[in-house]
Each structure stands twice: as structure tokens, then as C-alpha cells.
């Protein structure tokens, strides 16, 4: 399994499995390359999968973000992966953060060398705008972004620390309360708040349950998302490849209407609705995901 040199001199881990046409799959926030394996297993004889661990996660956990724009940072790493493996005529897939990274690549440089793109449960515009209310958290964005701002302010007071679990108890209590509010708001389950508040006070539980446990990484992602991110909608009009969009119709993070609006921008888009799924269709409807992934890999029958 190679560690790929990237432009800042670090080495990013990329798991490579299978044989055949190349497929580059970009992970969501906190996801490890190994999480893809059960779903790609049926296709290893026809496709060669390149599965990176993004900076800060999996076997790339030791690599820090090196710029304020996390989306641009990950995009540059993806460019370096493509160049290192000499990928061309390849399939590209991205879920959540990986989807934003792929759309960032399309906006900045285009999807050159990509034959088809699979986009999984991510809005083409994370921040709400006067003409767009389908960003992260939808109509509750101001409320939940306010809580994320408070968490960011708290972390700004502890930049000398490495991990959130190292913060003083009073600060951990405040962070846990804010995280519990955010989680309850995301899921629509207010009864979770007292449970999560107590659970997350423990340093060990903070590290175990949070996808981001480092202070610097958490601050970077909070800034990226609360800042509104990027608007990738209009760049999709020039997207040169067919796009398949997998939508969790019960997604608590991104309104299905906003995800499906990709078809209003991309010249060649196909929408796949996962009616029983939230933000992670591969976990909520795994059999359907494997089946639809196969259709994407082999080229969907369009009609």
C-alpha cells in the first residue's frame, strides 16, 4: 500500500486494491479507506480502486492540514494522487467532504481524465445564499452555525493544546454541551442532548466519538463550513462528464432538494434516490448502494 508524496513534502496513504479500470474514491469527514472495502468487494476483478485516507484520518492521521481552505488542501492532494498514479480515463467518486473536494476540482481545473463522476450526499453549495437555502442544515443553518461559532471561539482559547480531550474540565463541559446541541439539531432528537453532554465530557469518549479530536483540525473544519465554503453550482454547467448523484432522502445534513438540484446545473446528471437513507446511504441501504455502485462503475443504462 503506497504512501504518495504530495506537494508539501508529506506522504499521504492511498489503499490500492483490485485490477482493471481505475476508480478514485474520495472519503467523507472522518472516514477511513478501509470503510469502502465491503462495498467494492464484488467489483475487484474488473476495477482497480484507489482509496486515499485524507489528512488527519486513517493512516494519514499524522499529516496536518497546511492551509486555511480545507477543500483546496484536499483538492491539491487529489491532484497529486492522480499525477502519482498516472490516472487517466478513470472513474471518480466522492461522499460528503469527498464530494465537495471533487466539485472543487471541477471548479478550479475541470475533471480532466475523468470518465464518470459519482456524487454521494453532498450539497453543491454548503452555505445558504439569497438564492439558495439548501446548504448544510438547511433552514436551521443560522441556528446551528451559531453553535459552531461558539465552539470555534472556545477552541480558539486553547490553541496551545493538541487534543480536545486535553482541555480543562470546564471547557470540556462547554464543548460537550455545544456538541450535544449540534448533534441533537442534526438528528432532530432533542432527547440525545443530556446523554451526549455527559458522554462527551470524558476525554476518552471525546476522542472515540468525534471524527475530529485535534484542536487545530477541528478549528480548520469549523472555519471552512461556517464560512460558507464554496458555491460549485455554476461550475457544474461546464462539467464535461456524466454525473450520478446518490441522495439520502432522509439526510439530516443536506436537503434532498438541494442535492437533486445538481441535475439543474450539470449537463448530464442522473439522480438515484435512497428513500430509507440519511447522510450515509452505504450504511443505511448497503445492498442498494452496492447495486447502484455497480451500475455506475459499468456505465448506467440511460433511458
Name each model feature, range by range:
Residues 115-168:
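Flexible "cap/lid" loop of the alpha/beta hydrolase fold
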Residues 35-37, 60-66, 129-131, 256-257:
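Conserved catalytic-core motifs of eukaryotic protein kinase domains, centered on the activation segment
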Residues 7, 41, 51-97, 106-108, ...:
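Active-site loop/oxyanion-hole signature of alpha/beta-hydrolase fold enzymes
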Residues 1-23, 44-48, 83, 87-88, ...:
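Alpha/beta-hydrolase fold catalytic core
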Residues 188-264, 270-273:
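Conserved serine/cysteine hydrolase catalytic core
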Residues 10-63:
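Conserved HGGG/HGGXW glycine-rich cap/lid loop of the alpha/beta-hydrolase fold
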Residues 274-290:
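Catalytic histidine-centered segment of alpha/beta-hydrolase-like enzymes
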Residues 88-131:
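Conserved hydrolase catalytic core segment
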Amino acid at each position: 500500500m503506497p504512501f504518495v508524496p504530495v506537494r508539501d513534502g508529506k506522504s499521504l496513504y492511498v489503499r490500492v486494491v483490485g485490477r482493471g479500470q481505475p476508480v478514485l474514491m474520495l472519503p467523507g469527514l472522518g472516514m477511513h479507506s478501509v470503510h469502502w472495502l465491503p462495498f467494492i468487494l464484488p467489483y475487484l476483478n474488473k476495477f482497480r480502486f484507489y482509496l486515499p485516507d485524507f489528512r488527519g484520518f486513517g493512516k494519514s492521521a499524522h499529516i496536518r492540514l497546511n492551509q486555511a481552505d480545507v477543500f483546496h488542501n484536499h483538492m491539491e492532494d487529489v491532484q497529486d494522487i492522480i499525477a502519482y498514479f498516472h490516472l487517466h480515463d478513470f472513474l471518480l467518486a466522492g461522499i460528503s467532504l469527498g464530494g465537495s473536494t471533487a466539485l472543487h476540482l471541477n471548479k478550479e481545473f475541470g475533471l480532466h481524465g475523468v470518465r464518470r463522476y459519482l456524487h454521494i450526499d453532498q450539497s453543491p453549495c454548503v452555505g445558504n445564499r439569497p438564492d439558495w437555502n439548501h446548504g448544510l442544515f438547511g433552514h436551521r443553518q443560522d441556528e446551528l452555525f451559531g453553535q459552531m461559532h461558539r465552539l470555534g471561539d472556545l477552541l480558539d482559547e486553547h490553541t496551545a493544546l493538541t487534543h480536545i480531550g486535553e482541555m480543562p474540565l470546564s471547557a470540556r463541559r462547554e464543548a460537550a454541551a455545544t456538541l450535544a446541541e449540534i448533534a441533537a439539531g442534526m438528528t432532530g432528537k432533542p432527547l440525545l442532548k443530556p446523554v451526549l453532554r455527559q458522554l462527551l465530557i470524558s476525554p476518552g469518549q471525546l476522542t472515540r466519538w468525534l471524527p475530529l479530536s485535534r484542536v487545530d483540525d477541528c478549528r480548520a473544519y469549523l472555519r471552512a463550513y461556517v464560512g460558507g465554503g464554496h458555491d460549485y453550482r455554476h461550475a457544474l454547467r461546464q462539467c464535461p462528464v456524466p454525473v450520478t448523484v446518490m441522495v439520502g432522502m432522509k439526510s439530516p445534513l443536506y436537503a434532498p432538494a438541494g442535492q437533486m438540484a445538481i441535475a439543474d446545473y450539470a449537463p448530464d446528471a442522473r439522480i438515484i434516490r435512497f428513500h430509507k437513507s440519511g447522510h450515509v446511504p452505504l450504511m443505511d441501504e448497503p445492498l442498494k448502494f452496492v447495486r447502484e455502485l455497480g451500475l455506475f462503475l459499468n456505465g448506467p443504462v440511460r433511458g
